[in-house]
Every structure is written in structure tokens, then in C-alpha cells.
Amino acid sequence: MELCKLAGVSRSGYYRWIAASNQRAIREASDYQDFLLIKEAYDYRGYAKGSRGICMRLKRMGITMNRKKVQRLMRKYNLCCPIRKANPYRRMAKALRTSTIAPNYVKRQFRSYGPRKVLLTDITYLRLKQKHVYLSVIKDAYTMQILAYQLSESLEIDFVLETIKSLMRNHLYEMNAEVWIHSDQGCHYTSVAFQRLLNDFRLRQSMSRRGNCWDNAPQESFFGHMKDELQPYVNTWDCFQDVKERIDDYITYYNNDRYQTTLGGMSPNEYYHYVVTGKKPSALVG
């Protein structure tokens, strides 16, 4: 009784606290077990995920967990996901340039025409010790799949041309005269060599308006998320081959295992299969 007075609590309140201790212990144990599942989903394939990505991965593990609960347990156990930062690096190296700027035919209608109709392309950089390497990517705006990519130590135009050639080697049967290749107005895409190559392959060209990143927003989004998820590996890269191997692994992961809310919780490759066949992954059926 004296202890209750010193603590400023009633005797009945003290006994209620004692009686509830078992329930608190049970809740703590349950939280920890659920957190272990969250951590397993977070660590899957070695790339960090936010609460949405964790919920979608848990579903593939046969576990349904409320997103608010996932967020609560992430805060409780200090599990943080990376936050994307704006990309300050917008200027690319010199390349042959023409005054031929294609109109913005796509007009942000990224997902209005189905798969293999609007293909987005852009270049970003990745840090390697005291220098940069450069990644050129082609992304299907409808399925979000990465269809072709090339990594280069140089900003010379060759690797951008090779990205288009890789697209045609691997997806030739899907390409036709209705395909748009949409980019910004960077010097690579206005070059004679690039425009001639598109013409040779009978691919149509569309360009964002100058200084308007929203005109190529899905591609910008991909680069932003990719850089966040690759951040833990940047300081482990010693040479160009290290970066290449990680990019190869990441693109495979992204296409096959990075589930997206926009795609109904499917990965890009799963979504393309669903669009073509009408069949969802078994984990999402029922």
C-alpha cells in the first residue's frame, strides 16, 4: 500500500497492471514474431522495401498483414526504408546534336494504349568510386517492364544506340510501326545517329517538352527507386564489372519480383503475362 502511495497510483490500478502483464508479454511476443516476417519480406532478394512492398511480398509468402500494422512494427523496431531524393544530375556529356526535336506525341498517356506501344528511354548515372558509369534503359510504360538496358563507362552515343539494338534483338516480334520511343530532348536522342536508327527499325519518336520531367515521369520514377534500393551496395563496388553484375541482378529482380501497387500487386513480368493470358499469379487468386 505504501508503494502505491509513493508511485501515485491506486491499489486497484496497481493490481490491474499486474493482471495485464501477461497480456502485454503475449502482445510483445506476437509483435516480435510478426516483425520477423516483415524483416524476411524486407530483406527478400537483398533490396530494401517500403511498407507497400513488404505487404505485397508477405502476400506471396501466404501472409496477409495490414499495412498500418507493418508501418507500426517498422517504427517500433526501427526498420527504415530509403527515401528517394531528387536527382540533381541532369546534364549529359557532349554528343552530335541536331535541331530536329520530335513533338510530344505521347502527352503523358503512358498507359492508354496497352503493352509495347509506348516505350520510355532515358539515361542516368551511378557512382563508382571517384567517377560515374552510365545506364541507358528502355521501359514499357504500360507493363513497367525493363525491355532493354546498357551500362557504359562513357557517355558517347554508342551505348544508347546499343540499347535500341538490344530491344530489337530481344523483342523484334513485338515491335511494329505503332511503337513510340519516348525520351527527353537530350543530345543523344536528337542526334542524327539515334534518329536514323529509329527510322531504320521503323520506330516512331516522341520527345518530352524541354525542362518538363513529368513528361517522362515513369522512367524518372524507376531510376529514383532503383538508386534508393542500390544504395547499400554502392560502396562495395570496386570496378565496372561489379556495377554491371549488380545492375544485371537488379533488373532481373525488378522485372520478376518487385511487386507494384499500380500493377495490382504483380511484378512487371507477371503483369505482362496477365495482360496477355488473363491469368493472375496463383498467390493473388482467391
Locate each region found by the language model:
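K/E-rich alpha-helical interaction surfaces of small helical-bundle regulatory domains
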Residues: 1-22, 44-47, 246-264
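Basic, flexible linker segments flanking DNA-binding modules
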Residues: 4, 13-114, 212, 269-277
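RNase H-like polynucleotidyl transferase catalytic core
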Residues: 83-87, 180-185, 199-218, 234-239
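An active-site-proximal beta-strand-loop segment
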Residues: 108-147, 153-155
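C-terminal domain-tail junction helix/linker
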Residues: 192, 199-203, 225-286
